């Protein structure tokens, strides 16, 4: 059992650790690979970094990150354009004037959507939320006829384009089964020949001695086949047996 005197120093250690530890400013640590990569890509004297920066500018050109103030400016300019078009809708035509008015079609959203605001007759209204730009896509469209290209046309049969030409007399397949060969036709198909030409073998044999190939049967070929099997032979000479012995 540990005596009470030894427990007191041990309980005083957590109190010492709770005090603020003095810290030193040792500067920047070693750069990690990601920091080095970003630093190299920001240089102006490297061909790879220049290509990366050019690509970043091209990406930023087609990436629109509009702030709230810019969205309000665009919305006000859009309302001004709608009002201008409504004012220019009255066009004189000959002796009488025909009045044309522009209509702004706004899709009806869900009844509890606070982001949808309907435009008035003069085109005034607040900016709608991005979720209310196309409310028709939230549910299937109704009353819209199906598009024609969605139906695949399956042909009932196949009609060969050469059918009308093969019906003529010139294209009849029964009259000429093969192409006629002319008299001066030469066949250039190559066949294996011995070295020196095809007439070397004929020069070996004389004209008076016709060459007759020998007919070897299977058993004759097996008899003439050399045997390489070896049998152990002793020092005693093998003598043929005779009646005298």
Curated annotation (Swiss-Prot):
Residue numbers of Phosphoserine PTMs: 31
One Pfam family it belongs to: Calsarcin
Location in the cell: Cytoplasm, Myofibril, Sarcomere, Z line
GO cellular component: Z disc
Record text on subunit structure and interactions: Interacts with ACTN2, LDB3, FLNC, PPP3CA and TCAP.
Protein name: Myozenin-3
Primary localization class, coarse: cytoplasm
Region called Disordered, residue ranges: 93-134
Family recorded in the similarity comment: Belongs to the myozenin family.
Record keyword Phosphoprotein present: yes
InterPro entries: MYOZ
Positions of the UniProt region annotated as Binding to FLNC: 67-108
Function according to Swiss-Prot or TrEMBL: Myozenins may serve as intracellular binding proteins involved in linking Z line proteins such as alpha-actinin, gamma-filamin, TCAP/telethonin, LDB3/ZASP and localizing calcineurin signaling to the sarcomere. Plays an important role in the modulation of calcineurin signaling. May play a role in myofibrillogenesis.
Binding to ACTN2, PPP3CA and TCAP: annotated span: 50-67
Gene: Myoz3
Tissue: Expressed specifically in skeletal muscle and is enriched in fast-twitch muscle fibers. Not detected in heart.
């Amino acid at each position: 059992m540990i005596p009470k005197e030894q427990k007191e120093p041990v309980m005083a250690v957590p109190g010492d650790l709770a005090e603020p530890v003095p810290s030193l400013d040792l500067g920047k640590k070693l750069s990690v690979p990601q920091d080095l990569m970003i630093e190299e890509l920001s240089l102006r004297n490297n061909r790879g970094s220049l290509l990366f920066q050019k690509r970043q500018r091209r990406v930023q050109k087609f990436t629109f990150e509009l702030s709230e103030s810019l969205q309000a400016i665009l919305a006000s300019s859009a309302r001004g354009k709608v009002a201008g078009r409504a004012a220019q809708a009255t066009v004189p035509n000959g002796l009488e004037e025909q009045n044309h008015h522009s209509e702004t079609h706004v899709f009806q959203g869900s009844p509890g959507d606070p982001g949808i605001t309907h435009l008035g007759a003069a085109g005034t209204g607040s900016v709608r939320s991005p979720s209310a730009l196309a409310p028709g896509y939230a549910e299937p469209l109704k009353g819209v006829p199906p598009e024609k290209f969605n139906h695949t046309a399956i042909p009932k049969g196949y009609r060969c384009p050469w059918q009308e030409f093969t019906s003529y007399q010139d294209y009849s397949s029964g009259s000429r089964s093969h192409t006629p060969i002319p008299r001066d036709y030469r066949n250039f198909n190559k066949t294996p020949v011995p070295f020196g030409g095809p007439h070397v073998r004929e020069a070996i044999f004389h004209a008076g001695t016709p060459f007759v190939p020998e007919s070897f049967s299977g058993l004759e070929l097996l008899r003439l086949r050399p045997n390489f099997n070896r049998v152990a032979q002793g020092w005693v000479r093998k003598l043929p047996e005779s009646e005298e012995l």
